[in-house]
Amino acid sequence: MSAYRRKRRGGNIRKALWILLILLTLGALQQTLWPNARLSWTAQAEKEAIGIIVPPPGDYAEEVLTAVGSYYGSPDISMNMGQPLFTEEDRQLGEQHETEGYESYADLDALGRCGPAFAVLTKATMPTEKRESIGDVRPSGWHTVRYDDLIEDKYLYNRCHLIAYMLSGENANPQNLITGTRYLNISGMLPYEKRVADYIENGGGAVLYRATPVFLGDDLLARGVELEAEALRDPEFSFHVFLYNVQPGVRIDYASGQSKREA
């Protein structure tokens, strides 16, 4: 009996060591993957004059989706240990526009899809007027479809702002609107948007902010949004997350935006 217990204990130790090794490897991978994968989309010292944001490379979406994995029951997952990947150029741009703020939106691509949106958010960028209708904007992958018994607000899709209206005052801008599920919009993006808005309104100062829709291949619907924020003068206020563009109970075809009820 005692020999069996010693053997079992040794097996458990070996198993624990293997698990620890795997976790350390995954942690190192997550820590190093993103800086190597990301382009410096906002090296504005060179680009600001002509207003260019370079879209991410084609394989970037595959790297992101491989790292974050499939939806697992939570609307968000941390990326790069929660640390955003803003460059020194981004921070210099923040310092230049620390009071009045700054916003830059990528041009739509050949499929009509949004690219990254970057901003230096301040009280000056927040809206002072009532929000108007955005119903005339039809972002890529848009369909008007309802699941009344699955979704409290009935409709599967919202026109989701990459940079929220409450933060930017930017409303019916096609370069700032993607097709997102109600779940992405309300459970995923809204809590982070409110967190940033509260920080600024309570005197926290300027915040660097980037929202990157992640499209796989020629998909018209983004698989999710990579969201980063960092206070210009307070590095303790920051986050870096991936938000899943899913809707529990609904199966989505990301190539077209079509959907059906899960069996």
Residue locations for each model-derived region?
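Residues in intrinsically disordered, low-complexity segments of regulatory proteins
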Residues: L17, L33, S40, G101-S104, ...
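N-terminal, intrinsically disordered, polar/charged segments of Gram-positive cell-envelope systems
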Residues: A37-G94
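Polar/charged alpha-helical tracts
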Residues: R14-K15, E62, T66, A222
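N-terminal Lys/Arg-rich, disordered targeting/topogenic segments
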Residues: M1-I13
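Hydrophobic single-pass membrane-insertion segments
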Residues: Q30-T42, E230
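Hydrophobic membrane-insertion alpha-helices, especially the h-region
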Residues: A16-Q31
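Domain-level detector of nuclease and nuclease-like folds
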Residues: E88, E95-A263
